[in-house]
Amino acid sequence: MSMAGAERPVSSAAGLPVRWALAVVLALLAIQATALFAMGRVPICTCGTVKLWHGVVQSSENSQHLTDWYTFSHIIHGFLFYAGTWLLLRRWSWTARLIVATLIEGGWELTENSSFIIERYRAGTISLDYYGDSIVNSVADTLAMISGFLLARWLPIAATVAIAVLFEVLVGLHIRDNLTLNVIMLIHPFDAIRQWQAGPPII
């Protein structure tokens, strides 16, 4: 059973037509991009190209293109935000909860690209070449979260959990980093984890 099938009836005050939700989400994405530009983020990779996929983590082009290994973490963000809003805001429509999720993700993207967090990543994690996201990458990250949110709405709960675990394990074994390790190393870096992350791909 999916969470969508288990939702309670939505009050009229909390309901929001899809077209209006889409308009709000697009406006939030525009605000996110504008704020990032004001913060000094570059619109696209300084290499002058925009790639659909860039798979080299230890590279100055990481987090500069449309998708990369960390895109999977943002899809998981969508899973988590759907579950969280489903638990806390059950009487809200899924469209209203999507707006909440987009606000949270956009807020994180702005925080992640602040000087404090960038330096935190560089000092405490393996991301020595990280100098912040390009605007196109940051917006694509939010779109990845939205895709995860929508997947969680339609997939059975067991399938959503299985996909999240699969992403974490496979990405972790390949680049020695994932959402879980990223959060741990951001909050409290461990030398043992940092040393492990310096190794080659396991798969």
Curated annotation (Swiss-Prot):
Recorded topology in the membrane: Multi-pass membrane protein
Main location: membrane
Transmembrane segments: 20-40, 69-89, 155-175
GO cellular component, one term: plasma membrane
Keywords assigned: Cell membrane, Membrane, Transmembrane, Transmembrane helix
Location of this chain's protein in the cell: Cell membrane
Coiled coil start-end: none
InterPro entries in alphabetical order: DUF2585
Family per record: Belongs to the UPF0314 family.
Protein name as catalogued: UPF0314 protein Rpal_0309
Species of provenance: Rhodopseudomonas palustris (strain TIE-1)
